[in-house]
Structure formats: C-alpha cells, structure tokens
A protein has these predicted regions:
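Hydrophobic alpha-helical segments
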Residues: 1-179
Length: 179
C-alpha cells in the first residue's frame, strides 16, 4: 500500500504521476527524451541502462518494467537483458556497453565515483561524449525515479506477465503521461 492516497492498483510511477500531473508530466517527458530521443545508443541499450540502475537500486517495479521494454526492443536478442542483469562481466554485449554500464553503476552509487579513467575507458571502446553524457543522465534520472517510486511505496505487481505486457507497450508507445 502506498504511503499516500493514490489510485489503487495503478502500478509504479504511473500512480504517482496521476496523483500530481504537474510534476509527473515533465518526468515522463524526460524519460521520453532519454529513452526514445535521438541517440547513437539504441532504445534497447538505453532501456537496459535504466533496468541495470534500477536493479542496483533494488527497485523491482522499474527494473522489471524497463527490463521487459529492453527485451521487447532487443527482439531475438532479448536474452542479453537477463545476461547483463545476472552477470554483466560475462554478458554478450560490446565492451563499449560494458564500459557505459560501469559508469552507470558508479552514478547509481554516487556521481563523484565516476573517474576520468572510467570515461577514458568508455571512449577507448568507441563511446562518444554524447553517449557518455546520456548514460550518466539516464543513470541519474533512474536513481531519482527509483527513489520516487520506493519512497512513496507505490504498488509493485508481482506477476511477471504484467511486466512483459508493460514492456511491450513501453517499447511501442514510449512515454506519455497518463491523462
């Protein structure tokens, strides 16, 4: 049960955005730009960053929904998502993506944990400054989203099938604030 009076049964951040649309709308707009806007990182990769940070923050709703969206976007390569979430070191992703996820993981702990060596390592693997920037911003934004969802104890479904449907919808439609 949520700590505040939100609509019963509406999961995660959606119930909080419905409670306070004037603050929720900009959050959805930020998610849309970060996860669906123009980027050389694929939408699947950006959703994976969101899921990875959410897992590290132990925010089940965000981890499950964004992992499902990433799986939907990866299509036939959807096993990549679970491989990363279970064991990033042995996951079948590029060294560039591993370097970017390393940065995201450090941002999740504390932004100041990211070192010049981390950035140089990502660049050495082919990451652009925009990709590094966007990785840091996705990690920072999802750390905030995770704290928002958990801090108000929003409803978290336990049925994995709900997340798969949610992920497909997010992959197809992106992020629009509820009306």
């Amino acid at each position: 049960m949520a700590h505040i009076n939100v609509e019963d049964g509406v999961p995660g951040i959606r119930s909080l955005v419905m409670f306070r649309p004037e603050t929720g709308k900009p959050l959805y707009e930020l998610a849309q730009v970060l996860l669906r806007g123009e980027s050389t990182l694929t939408e699947a990769e950006r959703e994976l960053i969101a899921a990875y940070v959410s897992k590290r923050n132990d925010t089940m709703f965000c981890m499950m929904s964004h992992a499902a969206a990433s799986r939907a976007l990866y299509g036939d390569d959807k096993n990549i998502v679970d491989d990363v979430l279970n064991d990033i070191k042995h996951a079948n992703i590029s060294d560039k993506m591993k370097a970017l996820l390393n940065i995201a993981g450090k941002v999740q702990v504390l932004g100041k944990e990211v070192t010049q060596q981390d950035v140089d390592a990502a660049r050495d693997e082919g990451a652009t400054d925009k990709e590094i920037h966007d990785t840091v911003l996705i990690a920072a934004a999802f750390s905030m989203f995770n704290r928002y969802v958990d801090g108000l104890a929003s409803f978290t479904p336990t049925d994995e099938n709900e997340y798969e449907a949610m992920g497909k919808r997010m992959a197809e439609k992106g992020y629009a604030a509820p009306k």
